[in-house]
Amino acid sequence: MAKIGQKMGKKKLYDGVRLFGFGQKTGIDVPGEDSGIVRSLRKWDGYSVTRVPFGHEITATVIQLARAYCILANGGSLITPYIVQAVFDENGEIKKFPHPSSLASHIIKPEVANWIVREALVDVVKEGTGKSAALEKWQVFGKTGTADIADKESGYGSTNYVSSFAGGAPAEHPKVVVVVSVRKPKKSLGKGYTGGRVAAPVVKEILQKTLTYLEQN
């Protein structure tokens, strides 16, 4: 990751992070959304290109991460997430909720997005740290995350973590994207603390039940 960041350089890496919506609100239809933190380019130093790809120097919300994966799953098209699908009037009839419009333009080329989903992220589940998210019937794609929690006084430590897994299925034609993030997982439960052991199995269960439901309805 650090080598990729160095190869891209500060400007391209910064533009890519912003292009996927990090450091800005997604526009989801709920109050109090946080924009996360992405420092302006002028505040990046020579080490930023190696730190940012690992998630250091920035903060992101779960909905931002989910949207980023939805962009990949939708072939590179920028989308605006929403909570409410429809509302009912006093007669019980459905009224469509005015969803925020998604941009038709691609922020990355479809072939690049498809390669990331169907090759790179599938390999994580098949052969890498995301094996615990694998399903028998559907091909899962995704990426594990095990982030150190920064302390105000001592900086990044090695005792507290945020363990996550972001992904979806089926890889060939994605229908569902799921992000599970667990802050300070309890090692005493015997599942360790990594995203592959803590969050990936939860994503597997959610995907299994959701895809089964969609198939039957």
Segments from the language model and where they lie:
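Short, gly/Ser/Thr-rich active-site loops of penicillin-recognizing serine hydrolases
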Residues: I94-K95, R197-N217
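Short alpha-helix boundary/capping segments
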Residues: S158, G190-V202
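Beta-lactam-recognizing serine transpeptidase/beta-lactamase-like catalytic domain environment
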Residues: M1-K184, G195, Q216
